[in-house]
Amino acid sequence: IYDVLNSLKLKGLVEIKQERPQKFRAVEPKIALQILSNDLLAKLSNIKQTIFSEIEKLRTQDRSLLLEEPNVWIIRNLDKAKQKIKSLIESANVDIVVSSPSSLVNELKDSIVFLTRNRKNVTAAIVCYCDESKVQVNSNEAILLKQRPTPSLPIIMIDGTYCIVFAEDYSLELGEPELMRILSDFFYYSIWRPSKPLTKFKLDQEKTTSHIWLAIEIMKMSKKEDLTVKVNGFERKSRSVVEIEGSIVDYKLDPQGIFKNFTLISNEKKYLVGGLGASVEDIEARLITISKKK
């Protein structure tokens, strides 16, 4: 019985009078309940911190466990959406990819011209759903311009990280990486590839893009042996950040849509470079810079 009483003493639930024999007295019930309650809360707090710590470890190891709100918004005010996209076009740092009726392209004309004249490294690729005579943006702005005789979705992608898709009375604003990857592939296979060129693009200066297919399209318009390409991205297996620069050995943009990649040689080593979500290549490119060799 003394072991039990000593245990209760350690918990602060009994008091001991030091005499022979020892005398024990229970503390007041209100005080005892408070002591037990505090002890239980402390244990629960420790358990909570342990659980949070383990969850954080998992979150850093696997991004699929991140409980973030999807970056998808509906904009009901189309004028507001157009004003926003004009501002984003003018401040683009990497590329703009546009597919729309000529009316919308012409509304965006001033912003597109401002971009191509003030940020000459930014790549602008545009597909118009219209008669080419209605397009007011011309080849003087060094734009990759195409025409599609039948309409599809009006899509505007900025820097490979932001997109607005226009519907009849609303627009979707998207920033989810997986959706951007899907839209980029959709744009290339369903919109860009079936369209006919309206201008003959010439690589006069350095161009950047976040889309692997657009980089290869630019490469196809030049002699690959004349090009220098810099790639910023990730090593596919280790996910370590990489930056490599070298010459083009080959590129692949097959009709079946299975492969979109190019081979780069840098410091006598060959690298197979793919785009966002690369699954078989050595490098997953996020930014591709193409220029003529000096």
Describe the function of each predicted region.
Residues S37, N46-N71, K80-K82, S152-L153, ...:
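Inter-domain helical "communication" segments and dimerization helices
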Residues V165-K237, I283-S291:
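Signature of lipid phosphatidyltransferase scaffolds
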Residues K30, Q34, D39, K43-A124, ...:
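PLD-like (HKD) phosphodiesterase/transphosphatidyltransferase domain
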